[in-house]
A protein has these predicted regions:
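Extracytoplasmic metal-acquisition and chelation regions
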Residues: 29-306
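Sec-dependent bacterial lipoprotein signal peptides
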Residues: 2-27
Length: 306
């Protein structure tokens, strides 16, 4: 379980040290050990959510993230220590939509812990991580984050620390302003490539693409953790050629074999998109800078043939 620092979501080109992995829950504490941090805790499933929550929380709560960097949340399995570590948290923040609901199947794991689904108030796009679910990747649209995620984060953390409600609300307002500025920056950065199509490693970018006028034509990985079949890859090649695609994107959390094969067949370059980022990932170690990174990558890739 990774701790998030209590600081603003990262802006452009910044970096900072992050705390180490937590000690096992319930370990004994002798008199010569450092005193425990008694700050109330909140748990977030993925890094972007944890980073947003850490800013809103400030020093009022310690936010811990379950999924480590470079892991795929849709195939992630929490360890027994991580499951045990949820006990006693003041809030459990999850995305929902079938992507990060692993603990809901563990009897008693969330007993007594208030659970908040960020996607609970959003009409999800088609194309989810599980049977009958919609696309859960709503955090890649900063307007949805500002208008839907942020109020839920604020309410959950204020309920966890009612004595700190005014400070939590003030930090949420400041974050809303930063998200508005990010949206404006992305809209301007992507304006020259509006209407252009790209192929991603997996279908994570529908909300982002719809917000900023680009088109996610298709994805290499149709199922989490599985490389595409030869037939599926051939169909994607035909569709990409017909649409004039000249960029393919990989992601750090998924295998590159299919994406590299597709790019070689199309004779187009490969770029990196990162839906999750993480502590210590240069240029992607905070929500704001992560979205800027991805917007810049798409703008560069789609603008390279203009």
């Amino acid at each position: 379980m990774i701790r998030t620092p209590r600081r603003p979501p990262r802006g452009r080109g910044t970096s900072a040290p992050w705390a180490a992995v937590l000690l096992a829950v319930g370990a004994g504490c002798s008199t010569d050990e450092a005193p425990r941090d008694e700050t109330p805790r909140a748990i977030a499933t993925i890094f972007p959510l944890g980073d947003l929550a850490a800013f809103v929380a400030g020093d009022e709560l310690r936010v811990e993230v379950l999924v480590p960097s470079r892991a795929d949340p849709s195939t992630f399995e929490p360890s027994p220590r991580q499951v045990a570590g949820v006990a006693g948290a003041r809030a459990y923040l999850m995305v929902g939509g079938g992507m990060d609901e692993w603990l809901r199947s563990v009897p008693g794991a969330l007993a007594g812990v208030p659970e908040v689904r960020m996607n609970g108030g959003i009409q999800l796009r088609a194309g989810g991580e599980g049977e009958g679910t919609g696309d859960p990747h709503t955090w890649l649209d900063p307007v949805l984050v500002r208008d839907v995620w942020l109020p839920q984060i604020e309410r959950a953390l204020s309920a966890a620390r009612p004595d700190a409600r005014p400070r939590i609300e003030a930090r949420a307002r400041a974050l809303a302003d930063s998200l508005t500025a990010l949206d404006h920056w992305l809209a301007e950065r992507l304006l020259p490539v509006r209407g252009q199509a790209f192929v991603a490693t997996h279908s994570a970018w529908g909300y982002f693409a719809a917000r900023y006028g680009v088109r996610e034509l298709g994805a290499v990985h149709r199922s989490p953790g599985r490389e595409p079949s030869a037939r599926a890859l051939a169909e994607l090649v035909d569709a990409a050629r017909a649409a004039g695609v000249h960029a393919v994107f990989t992601e750090p959390q998924l295998g590159e074999t299919g994406a590299q094969a597709l790019a070689a067949e199309l004779e187009v370059p490969v770029y990196v998109l990162d839906p999750l980022g993480g502590p210590g990932v240069p240029g992607r170690d905070g929500y704001l800078v992560l979205l800027r990174f991805n917007g810049d990558q798409i703008a560069r890739a789609l603008g390279s043939n203009r």
